[in-house]
């Protein structure tokens, strides 16, 4: 196949791919997505559509420097959250290396920006699956593809397509019970999944009608990670601090850590 034939073949494939994406999102949304995401991301999104994982894409529900989260539906109309990691900045790359290099699951760290963001997405998916299997309430993981993570959408029961509020914006009605729930999740995470969230606070716990759901699992590390004790202590301290501000008579940091690690 000559250069001209290859170019024509590529252009025809791009046209077919774009037509397929038009079926799951309106043209304004697709144009916005094309402005933000590169071709490999669009190809991965196309594959998820072609594989029957995503049926319809709606708008952005959360946007940050590292990722955007979209409300979507699967082909059967069930709500999904589609988290798409953006091109990795040098600052983000420096920030995540410590969560990867000490993790035995990712002993061959690739520092190429694209490969690193794919690894980070895969890491979050695997952490979600381990936490979910251990009985921790997290968004159910569905699929990871390149820099795209598909999972359960934790929505506001009152308005479809709107995410449930964060704990920082919607304090629990029964703080004592909520504290017990979160500490139980940390215990299960450590002793069943053998993980530490490593970034736990009221900023990444959702409150859906008093059901607490922990999100943002990219930073979670295995118990064998050299910094796991430091991360665990920080997680517990953050939770105790938050609930103490709500007026709860919280246990001491030492007491909680001893209970979790069994010493």
What are these regions (language model features)?
Residues 1-21:
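Long, low-complexity intrinsically disordered regions enriched in Ser/Thr/Pro/Gly
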Residues 14-38, 47-48:
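N-terminal, Lys/Arg-enriched amphipathic/low-complexity engagement segments
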Residues 22-25, 105-108, 163-165, 214-219:
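A short alpha-helix capping/helix-coil boundary motif
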Residues 33-163:
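Conserved ATP-binding subdomain of kinase catalytic cores across diverse folds
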Residues 86, 155, 202, 207, ...:
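Short, glycine/acidic-enriched loop or turn micro-motifs at the edges of active sites
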Residues 112-138, 144-145, 162-198, 203, ...:
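Conserved kinase catalytic-core helix
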Residues 171-178, 191-197, 208-263:
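C-lobe/activation-segment region of protein kinase-like
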